[in-house]
């Protein structure tokens, strides 16, 4: 547990933190990042591992080059978050009563049809807007009038948005 602000980094190992109530930066070159509770501003970066986040009520930016991201959010006012993976999947779990605006983007190849791209973003919520062009397939979701912004981006993976 980290009661204030902190920085944790490792060259190749895993990082597991119980709870962070302040701001923190977590980074590893090749391991996984596990965080079970945060209310501050968090940055989590790994080059080759997975990122697992639970009970996150603060802002978070999570980036992985070669892993998956699993995030369970409890969004509060102005707790904007961004999740990016180059070649992994993103799973977001969020309460159906959350006030949040979600933008899910999958980068697609020129030869992919819209119906094929549609299979890459699955959600328990109804999309408010869908945009498909030669590079991107984007679904936007506005829950309960919108609020904090959540961005989900993957270059070659799938995105799932589930009710918690």
Regions found by a protein language model. Give the residues of each.
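Intrinsically disordered, low-complexity terminal regions
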Residues: 1-164
């Amino acid at each position: 547990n980290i009661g204030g602000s902190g920085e944790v980094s490792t060259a190749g190992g895993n990082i597991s933190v119980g709870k962070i109530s302040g701001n923190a930066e977590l980074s590893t070159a090749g391991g996984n990042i596990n965080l079970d509770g945060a209310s501050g501003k968090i940055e989590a970066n790994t080059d080759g591992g997975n990122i697992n986040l639970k009970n996150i009520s603060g802002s978070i930016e999570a980036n992985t080059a070669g892993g998956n991201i699993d995030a369970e959010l409890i969004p509060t006012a102005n707790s904007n978050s961004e999740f990016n993976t180059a070649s992994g999947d993103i799973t977001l779990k969020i309460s159906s009563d959350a006030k949040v605006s979600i933008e899910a983007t999958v980068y697609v190849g020129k030869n992919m049809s819209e119906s094929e791209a549609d299979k890459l973003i699955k959600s328990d919520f109804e999309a408010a807007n869908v945009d498909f062009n030669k590079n991107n397939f984007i679904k936007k979701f506005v829950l309960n009038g919108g609020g904090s912004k959540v961005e989900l981006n993957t270059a070659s993976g799938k995105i799932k948005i589930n009710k918690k």
